[in-house]
Amino acid sequence: MLYADLYLLKPALIDAEQLIRLQSELSPDEYRHWHEIRQPGRQREYLLGRILLRRLLAERLGCPPDALVFRTGEHGKPTLVSHDWQFNLSHSGDWLVLALCQQGPLGVDVEMGLRQRPVLPLAQRFYAPEEYQWLLALPSRAQTSAFYRLWSRKEAVLKA
């Protein structure tokens, strides 16, 4: 069994003054990447995700956050150099989620289901025929939440 720590953060609760102070905790590469993000909400998510990740990993490893070195893998997923901690970040709507573990690769996904859209065409296109049939068999009022639950699980597996 895999044991992981999950952290939820609502980025909108962090005020502008705190965001300015937190920028100094980014590495030079992280700062450059953060600065290149043009959409303010995405910029806030990136900053807070990286700071949360650095602080929590540093706490577990007994080192300062700026001592952590990350490398980007061939598929763009960052990894921690020289340590066995695994992590994954996701965001949707007003929420940011971080998962940490030492037992192997993990993925996490959060979907708030805020977009009101017909989910059956998406399910027919992206899900296996058995999954699509399962979704069709549900009462119509349950289909949207079931769609997003399955979508999140699939996304988390792919991110691992």
Predicted region positions:
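Core catalytic alpha/beta fold that binds nucleotide/phospho-ligands
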Residues: 1-160
